[in-house]
Amino acid sequence: MCNMRNRYSLFLVLIIIFLSSLSTVCARTFEGSINFVRETVFDTTRINIYVKDSMVRVDERDTKNRLVSSHIVNLDKEEVYALSYSKELYKKLLVSSYSNDNGRISVKKTQNSKEINGHTCSQWRVRDERMNTEVAYWMCDGEFEFFSKLLNLLRRTEYSLAIFGAIPEVGGFIPMLTEERTLLRKEKLKIRIVDIEYNNPSSSLFGIPSHFKSVNRLS
């Protein structure tokens, strides 16, 4: 009887360990960097996103790879800071109450799929009659929960990632390729992910340099 109790206790311990490890794996979210290229008929720019825990940094660079804007986001605290490295200044952006403006757009999750950079992607088409645009998002399902939170937060500030703002609730998806066209099918812009790196970014990326001064406006 004692042996049976011991075996049963051991079995319970093993089950608990298994469930704990399973829950850790399931809760795991992306950490690392994601690099986008934004192409229009006029120029090509880059968007670099760094993720560590609940912190996100978004850098935008111009055609000559010069830093145009830099933002640090705390997803848990819902805080967004804009930084100017040339002026050594920073500003905390106002985050407004959530408002859902998706009533003006229609979303169709099509059956189309294709492989992009080794990832199988599904096509979501978002149509906005008022803006005379249709955007095709080739969405990759993964551990990118931060992306939905980031978009929902940024669209409530004066800064946004522009075309990504039209994406509805995306869960763990991220667009590997974004194609915007007019309703007459004329291409306006294209944004594609060129690199995804799983790593542990330095915490210094998500801090505001101590010598930067706080201001009400950066321009």
Predicted regions: what they are:
Residues 12-21:
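Bacterial N-terminal signal peptides
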Residues 2-12:
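Bacterial N-terminal signal peptides that target proteins for export
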